[in-house]
């Protein structure tokens, strides 16, 4: 079960970094 916790934390960290970059720079995704 601990592996699921590490994967969840890793995914959350990637999500935070992705949204930080997406909102910091002009949106270029989907254009």
UniProtKB/Swiss-Prot annotation:
Entry superkingdom: Bacteria
Biological process terms in GO annotation: photosynthesis
Annotated keywords: Membrane, Photosynthesis, Photosystem II, Thylakoid, Transmembrane, Transmembrane helix
Chain ranges passing through the membrane: 3-23
Keyword Transmembrane carried by entry: yes
Pfam entry (one): PsbT
Location of this chain's protein in the cell: Cellular thylakoid membrane
GO cellular component labels: photosystem II reaction center; plasma membrane-derived thylakoid membrane
Signal peptide: none
Main location: membrane
Membrane topology qualifier: Single-pass membrane protein
Subunit text: PSII is composed of 1 copy each of membrane proteins PsbA, PsbB, PsbC, PsbD, PsbE, PsbF, PsbH, PsbI, PsbJ, PsbK, PsbL, PsbM, PsbT, PsbX, PsbY, PsbZ, Psb30/Ycf12, peripheral proteins PsbO, CyanoQ (PsbQ), PsbU, PsbV and a large number of cofactors. It forms dimeric complexes.
Function as written in the Swiss-Prot or TrEMBL entry: Found at the monomer-monomer interface of the photosystem II (PS II) dimer, plays a role in assembly and dimerization of PSII. PSII is a light-driven water plastoquinone oxidoreductase, using light energy to abstract electrons from H(2)O, generating a proton gradient subsequently used for ATP formation.
Protein family according to the UniProt entry: Belongs to the PsbT family.
Protein name: Photosystem II reaction center protein T
Organism: Synechococcus elongatus (strain ATCC 33912 / PCC 7942 / FACHB-805) (Anacystis nidulans R2)
């Amino acid at each position: 079960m601990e592996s699921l916790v590490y994967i969840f934390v890793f995914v959350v960290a990637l999500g935070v970094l992705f949204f930080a970059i997406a909102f910091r720079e002009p949106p270029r995704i989907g254009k």
